[in-house]
């Protein structure tokens, strides 16, 4: 298996530190709003990568964090008139709802920043003791000039970064590139006690601490979006290696950005399309297919028109699978030469820098073969193709997966549809049918009320 390592810029043979075990850390969301398709891409891509590692026989220990204290969370809390924890708890719950809807499996660990504050303080103290960090009146900062390998991951030179620095000016810092480890509290902000006064952790230190505490001082894979390479991942690496003197992560994997309306999809610009809306309109497999049909390192253009096309393609495969399932011939095929050839092609694709576009195309090829085999009444081949889609490759890619439920229509959607039908019947003066719908709904505890602005309902 070969993957592109951002650290070296090369496609390298993947060899884990401990044979048979892969330890990986994926940067998770800052929880202050619903996740959009751009947020979902790394979560989905690296979940599928984890599934593939498991398919290849590895035991995977995966960590994905939640940043549950941050300026954006504090601003959202102030805007809503609630405390920061309410915002974080709410949007972590909403994240799980969307992740489940998209078929993203939980990692082994989902640490929250606020659960690791004591550990963060302890590690900042060690960095200060080692001379890599210093205190000012605004907090504690990492001294980038003290870490000789700073810029190694992002291929940036300190001198060039300082010359082009657009960092917020803080005259208490030794260099504009020095980044915050501990922020002194502002009035009214959530804070924790520390040797440097009350405050809260900086963004970069939290991921370093959580990954080291859970996975160890050195682990196999650190992953996330390419927009995190600098400064976030560069700073994580600097902190960890200054602390331990060891290689932090051996392989760095980064997915390309999602572009929407010509620009990077981003909450800060309002240029977003939420996962919830995408799944609701076009189904889980349509969005999964769209994301996996692009190589993870390439940028991905998003539009509703494109998503609609992917959704239609997925529906055609579901129709072929449904047609086969009606035959009732759901057995286990012989593992013959054709079976082995497809497995080899699948593994060859994903072993080559996780080439999901090729792997996904195999499923659609198999679907065409399945359709033809059914037309030819070739039951043996049909079973083989069906098995490969639903039981062999589907669970790895999370597409057409027997282990996942098909998209369900919610009871609320069905109720709204019934109300729409009833409104049409009333306009056509077909009161016998409209009243029958109203009365049957009342029997199951749903009370309709006709108003000038439309029909409202309550549930008893």
UniProtKB/Swiss-Prot annotation:
UniProt-listed Enzyme Commission number(s): 6.1.1.16
CDD domains with a match to the protein in the record: CysRS_core
Alphabetical list of InterPro entries matching this protein: Cys-tRNA-ligase, Cys-tRNA-synt_Ia_DALR, Cys-tRNA/MSH_ligase, Rossmann-like_a/b/a_fold, tRNA-synt_1_cat_dom, tRNAsynth_Ia_anticodon-bd
GO molecular function ontology, one term from the record: ATP binding
Top enzyme class: ligase
Record's cofactor remark: Binds 1 zinc ion per subunit.
GO CC annotation: cytoplasm; cytosol
Cofactor: Zn(2+)
Region forming the signal peptide: none
Record-listed ATP binding positions: 267
Motif ('KMSKS' region): 264-268
A GO biological-process term: cysteinyl-tRNA aminoacylation
Keywords, ordered alphabetically: Aminoacyl-tRNA synthetase, ATP-binding, Cytoplasm, Ligase, Metal-binding, Nucleotide-binding, Protein biosynthesis, Zinc
Domain of life: Bacteria
Compartments (UniProt record): Cytoplasm
Motif extent ('HIGH' region): 29-39
Residues passing through the membrane, by range: none
Assembly with partners or alone: Monomer.
Protein name: Cysteine--tRNA ligase
